Structure formats: C-alpha cells, structure tokens
Amino acid sequence: PFLDLCIWKGRFPSTKARFCSTELKREVILYKLQFPLIDQGYKIISWQGVRADESPDRAKLPISDNIGDGITNFRPIHKWSAQDCFDMHFKHHVEPNPLYKQGMGRVGCMPCIHCNKAELRAIADRFPKEIDRIQYWERKVGAASRRGSATLFTSDKRGHGIKELVEWSKTTRGGKHYDLIPLTEDQSACSSVYGLCE
C-alpha cells in the first residue's frame, strides 16, 4: 500500500506532508474500524502510544481529549521516557522489538522519513536489501512524478536519492570525511541508542 500511495501521489511523504501516517494508519482505523462501531452505538477510546519527548508536536498533545463523533483519544504513556517504556517491558518479561538492539531509534517503517544519520547507516550496514528496495521505489515513484524524480529523503547538500544519503551517513565533520571507526566494529553486535546492550 505504501508504494502504491506514493506512486498515486507522485512523491514520497515528508515532514510537512505525512500522508503515510494519515492515509495508511489514521484513516484506515477511522473508516474501517471506528466509524462502523460508532454507527452501531459504541463509544470509542483510542489508546495511543505516543510520548511527549518524541517530538515538539507530540509534547503539545494532552493525555486525553475528546475529538467528537464519539471518539476520545487516550495517551497513557505520554509523560513516560523511552527508558520508562523499556523498564515496563523488562518488568513484565517482554522482549522489546529486536530492531532496538540493532541501532534503530524507531521501528515501524524502514527506514522512516524521520530516521537520523546513524540509523540510516545502521540500516545500510545490517539490511542492505532495504536500501536496494528504496532505490527501486525511488525509480518507480519518480516515473510517476510530475518532476520526473522522487526521493525518500529530501535532496539537499547531503545528496540526491537513497544511495547518496547512505554514503553521507558514513561521514563525519559535516559530510566531508568518512568515519572509519565503524568499519572496525562488528556490525552484527548489539547496538542501541537506548542503552539496551549494557
């Protein structure tokens, strides 16, 4: 569905046009699940696992809000830190998503348009087929684009297209020098931005 949506729109989502979340998550849940239940007389409480420290926009969200039409949003972990989430996993003997021990700061889409430089490098090192898939998608979406080009990440001084961004992800000092230290490290070893390997 994601590739089809991008081809239909002739572009990839961006931080200002996050149609991926809107059309592939929010709208599907509303129209296929929540509205039919409301039509049957049910009230909906939508439990959402968003945390305030994930972004400035999420920090502004209330813990609970009634959005009308019989729907209330409830964000029980809004004030939690990432560490609080992992502590709750461990308290109940639930293993976190294994991607968190492979250098990923977020899981869901791979890569997410919000992934950072280190995460992009980790994806390229551990999952090179994902990078090839994105390159293929860029060609497909680019063919449908009015501009004749489409990239998952914004094209700027870092480069144009996933392959150039992966090369940039291997650099330090403003993208001018390759960071050689990771080349000496075991890429299959545990790596966590949340300290899960200690």
Where are these regions (language model features)?
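Nucleotide-activated chemistry modules centered on ATP-dependent adenylation/adenylyltransferase
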Residues: P1-E198
